[in-house]
Amino acid sequence: MHLSIDKLSKAYGFLWALRDVRLDFQPGQLAALLGPNGAGKTTLLRLLAGLIVPTLGSICFDGAEFAPGNSGLRRKIGFLSPADHLYENLTVGENLRFFASLYRRPHDAAIEENLAAVQLAARQSEYVANLSSGLKCRLSIAKWRLLQPELLLLDEPYGVLDGSGVDLLEDFLLAQCARGGIVVIASHHVARVLRLCNRAVILHQGRVTFDETKRQPWPSFDQAFGEFLPHGDP
């Protein structure tokens, strides 16, 4: 999948959350989306997920303009966030079976495999409502592992994960990119995502102020980051 964003803008009344964003993403890119609170990161992710519509501009996948009503394209997009939709009145296993049917993915063995990968195989019969926030996040990882979206968007995924959960998440993201997917992750854990990602995009006041792929002779993304984010931001 090739993702192209052209002149993308989003206004809420008189407030512009995004202004004239132009970005292109190639298969295999794992991009960090960085910036201070209110920079427009979540707005951009929600636009890419088809959850809101742009005021101006376009989003194209492989040359085809994306509209929220395009269910075929929607099935190629995953959005992992603290508000990732899970059915709390269903069990862990029932959730994965439901989403597998919705996205037309294989059941049974694949579900077992993905629950085992996030260490939830023994909890398949537990109701999601009874899980901790960290375990719900692991279930979301299993869900998107199963569904294999071509574009995976993540909004602050680290908050409720313990150390082993973080490792599971990052292994999954690297595997997604290795198979040709695109991953865009918004996070305030700057040093962590810059070590993980091969591209960094910084938003400030709704505009792209920095966009570079990881390359030498940069010793690390950490040093580059401080030059482009306004002083005092995380």
Region spans (language model):
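Conserved ABC ATPase "signature" region
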Residues: 97, 108-123
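H-loop/switch region of ABC-family ATPase nucleotide-binding domains
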Residues: 187-188
